[in-house]
Amino acid sequence: MPTPTLLDLYQSASKHSQYQVLPASLEKLLPGDQITVKSRHETARLAYIASKVSVCGLRVADVGGNTGFFSFELLDRGATRVDYYEGNKPHHDFVRAAAHQLGLNDRLHTFNRYVTFTHDELAGVDCTLLLNVLHHLGDDFGDAQLNKDAAKQNILACLAALSRQTGTLVFQLGFNWKGDRHQPLFTHGTKAELIDFVTQGTAADWTIESIGVAEKSGDAITFHELNRINLERSDALGEFLNRPLFIMHSKHV
């Protein structure tokens, strides 16, 4: 059987779930006319993250890294090493092959598994990206027997465990447990409820430095600092863009 090309691997990954835009470093390796990208506004989120966190010289973990947009972009921004974790094998295999073709094997370490958030699993990591992962607890990973209330407590337990392992956390959480709109994590589905949940539930372990909120101007999406206006839920933006983006610093590391 012939070895699959990078394009083959990308197209295989695309069949399994929503995926990301290509990082700049990969655009020259994959022909733009042969791929279809379903963006999750990665560029807008990256711009906000980069405005708040300098990763130059840092070891970074990208948990639930999908097709690697943030991993490759943070390497381009000077991260010394990125540990990429992804339980989805097609996604992982694509990122591993792309890292090889770019000569980044020594800086981009790939792990085809889900993070369990146990003690010292991410020890030595300076900054962790945990973007839109934990609302899948009890589904893609974790105890499948959990009910929703127990899952919410486990989400906070995961964040508490991370505070002992990584200095900076970039965090997003979805509004619906397991991605199911019939199982909302919060009664009214508002940003205020989600922010209160994270703020109050992590107060012993994390300092929240900033919260970015998506705003739309024309066709452009940008993340701005939380204020009383953008705190309001915007149904026109859809559920994904209502998710706040937290920049957090550990009280223990």
Task: For each feature predicted by the language model, list its residue ranges.
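Conserved beta-strand signature within the Rossmann-like core of class I S-adenosyl-L-methionine
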Residues: 154-156, 162-175
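Conserved class I S-adenosyl-L-methionine
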Residues: 57-66
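Rossmann-like AdoMet/SAM-dependent catalytic core
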Residues: 179-253
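Conserved alpha-helix/loop element of class I SAM-dependent methyltransferases that forms part
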Residues: 37-56
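Conserved SAM-binding motif I beta-strand of class I
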Residues: 81-86
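Glycine-rich SAM-binding Motif I of class I
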Residues: 68-72
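A short SAM/SAH-binding and catalytic strip from SAM-dependent methyltransferases
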Residues: 126-149
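S-adenosyl-L-methionine
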Residues: 96-122
